[in-house]
Swiss-Prot record:
This is 78 kDa dihydrolipoyllysine-residue acetyltransferase component of pyruvate dehydrogenase complex. One of its GO terms (cellular component) is mitochondrial matrix. The keyword Transferase applies. It catalyses: N(6)-[(R)-dihydrolipoyl]-L-lysyl-[protein] + acetyl-CoA = N(6)-[(R)-S(8)-acetyldihydrolipoyl]-L-lysyl-[protein] + CoA. It comes from the Eukaryota. Belongs to the 2-oxoacid dehydrogenase family. Keywords: Acyltransferase, Lipoyl, Mitochondrion, Transferase. It is found in: Mitochondrion matrix. The lineage of its organism: Eukaryota, Viridiplantae, Streptophyta, Embryophyta, Tracheophyta. Binds 2 lipoyl cofactors covalently. It comes from Solanum tuberosum (Potato). Its cofactor is (R)-lipoate.
Length: 21
């Protein structure tokens, strides 16, 4: 999910984005 983390962050799910948190 680390690779998809920034994608989730843009979608509106910063909780699933450890790298963007």
């Amino acid at each position: 999910i680390s690779a998809e983390a920034p994608l989730y962050a843009e979608v509106g799910m910063p909780a699933l984005s450890p790298t963007m948190t």
